[in-house]
Amino acid sequence: MAPSQLPPIFNPTQQDIEQLLAAQCHLGSKNLQVHMEPYLWKTRPDGVNVINIGKTWEKILLAARIIAAVENPADICVISARPYGQRAVLKFAAHTGATAIAGRFTPGNFTNYITRSFKEPRLIIVTDPRTDSQAIKEASYVNIPVLALCDTDSPTDFVDVAIPTNNKGRHSIGLVWWMLAREVLRLRGTLATRETEWDVVPDLYFYRDPEAEENKEIADESKVATAEEVGAGAIESGFAGENWDTQGAGAGVPGTAFAAASAAGPTSWEADGADWAASSAPAAAGESWAETQPAEGKW
C-alpha cells in the first residue's frame, strides 16, 4: 500500500485494510487496460495484476464525497447487471435512499422519455463498466456523471471516477458497496463519528445463491420432519406402555388371560356337550333319508 496523501482523519483503519485483503479486492485479472496502470501495484509471476488498495480506499472516499454532495438521494441511480452486485445495489439503495436498477438495464431508460421506466438521474454508479455498458453509453448522451467499480481490464470510456477493485468476486463487490454506503452515511452525519461502528455487517451486501438457499431450507425442513416423526413414535409407544401398565396386574399378559379363561372352561364345555348330544338327531334323520333314496336303476 502506497503512502496516503489524505488527511489523517481519512486514513483507513487496520480493520478496513484487513477486510479489503480478505475479500480479495486487490486481485485483478491477467489483462491490463492502459488507463488502469496508475492503480497497479505489481504483477505476480502467474500473470495476475495486483491492485493498490491504497488507491482503492482513496477512490472510495472521493466517490462518497460526490454522492453526499447530491441533495436528493433519489437522483442517484445505482446499477448492476452482474448477479454478484444486484443484492449489493439493492442494499445500498435501501440504506442511502438511492434508486436501484438490479438486473437487465432497459435501453432507453435515460434517453427515451416515452418509456415507463424513464429516469433523469444526476449521478449513476455501476458495478462493472463492461456489463453495464448500455447505461454508461446512455449517460454519456445526456451528460450524467458516472462512477464505476473498475478491474484492471475494465474499459474506462465515459467513466468519470473509477474505483479500482476486483469487480468479479461476490465478496469484493459486496464489501466495496458496503464501504461506500458507510462513508456516505458518515459524511451525511447519520453516523456521528468515524469511530462509530456501523451496525450493518458486510455480509448483508454479499450475493447469495437462491438455489443453495432453497436446498438448505429443504434440508432443514427434512431434518425437522424426521425429528418430529421420531418424537411422535416415542410418544405413541409411551402412551401404549402407560395403557398396558394402568389396566391392572396381569393386563397385557397373554398367560394370565388364558389361565382365567381355562378356569371357567369345564363348565362351559359341559354345557356345550349337552347341546352336541341334542344335535345328534339330525344325523339319524340323515340316515333315514339315505334309506329312502331310489335305486340307481329306478332313476
Curated annotation (Swiss-Prot):
GO biological process, one term: translation
Gene Ontology MF annotations: structural constituent of ribosome
Composition bias type Low complexity, residue spans: 259-291
CDD domains: RPS2 (cd01425)
GO cellular component: a single term: cytosolic small ribosomal subunit
Gene3D superfamilies linked to this entry: Glucose-6-phosphate isomerase like protein, domain 1
Record key words, sorted: Cytoplasm, Ribonucleoprotein, Ribosomal protein
Region (Disordered): 259-299
Compartments reported by the entry: Cytoplasm
Pfam families in the record: 40S_SA_C, Ribosomal_S2
HAMAP family: Ribosomal_S2_euk
NCBIfam families, alphabetized: uS2_euk_arch (TIGR01012)
Similarity-based family: Belongs to the universal ribosomal protein uS2 family.
UniProt function note: Required for the assembly and/or stability of the 40S ribosomal subunit. Required for the processing of the 20S rRNA-precursor to mature 18S rRNA in a late step of the maturation of 40S ribosomal subunits.
The protein's assembly and partners: Component of the small ribosomal subunit. Mature ribosomes consist of a small (40S) and a large (60S) subunit. The 40S subunit contains about 33 different proteins and 1 molecule of RNA (18S). The 60S subunit contains about 49 different proteins and 3 molecules of RNA (25S, 5.8S and 5S). Interacts with rps21.
PANTHER family reported in the protein's UniProt record: 40S RIBOSOMAL PROTEIN SA (PTHR11489)
Identification of the protein by name: Small ribosomal subunit protein uS2
Gene this chain is encoded by: rps0
